[in-house]
């Protein structure tokens, strides 16, 4: 099935973020929720939903999100995404494109992705950021239904994330390029520096084009100090070359990964 979700934001006359345009084909749907009573009070809080039991063989999923200047969007999902079993040679694909205009802010953390036995899932995400925009973007992947003895029973998982800063001359400057490629039949994914004995991997990328490296370094140090208190998770926090940081979390429960991220 070819499915598409496209949404954009606008700023109301009262300074609140609203949906400008919204288009979705099954199984996608988006609903708006009450705003948080904090710094995002004037932002839009929304939930991405799906009526499908999961991602099926041959699915092509396309997500397009565009934030207007000075708008803020917090986008969550309804439930876990399950990539169902597939015949050999079949696969599913998701492409996501996100555009942040000047001084816009986006928080986007979908529920964990669960890779069922014999599944193949590939995703590509490209994010373009305008001046002084802010991004909090994450993903959590489960290596299978562990209680069903599905540890690395999927065929392939790949995730490519590329983030760019938009420049005044119209060109794009690379900020982040992150690639995850899992092929259980060809890789020892339980080896040291891979997944080891953990079952869930979480990734969080934070970028704020209004902050300098010294400010980001303070955030990294504070997060590193907090992470030492977590005993059941393996957490790595790294400062990016400019404007941001990246967090990688390995754990054995989806809830624990979600909470720390």
Swiss-Prot record:
Question: Mind listing the UniProt keywords for this protein, alphabetically?
Answer: Chaperone, Cytoplasm, Nickel insertion
Q: What is its main location?
A: cytoplasm
- Pfam families from the UniProt entry: UreD (PF01774)
According to the UniProt entry, its GO molecular function terms are: nickel cation binding
- Keyword Transcription in record: no
Record localization: Cytoplasm
Q: Among the entry's GO cellular component annotations, what is one? A: cytoplasm
Family statement drawn from the similarity comment of this UniProt entry: Belongs to the UreD family.
Task of the protein: Required for maturation of urease via the functional incorporation of the urease nickel metallocenter.
Assembly and oligomerization: UreD, UreF and UreG form a complex that acts as a GTP-hydrolysis-dependent molecular chaperone, activating the urease apoprotein by helping to assemble the nickel containing metallocenter of UreC. The UreE protein probably delivers the nickel.
Q: What is this protein called?
A: Urease accessory protein UreD
Tell me the organism: Haemophilus influenzae (strain ATCC 51907 / DSM 11121 / KW20 / Rd)
Q: Which gene encodes it?
A: ureD
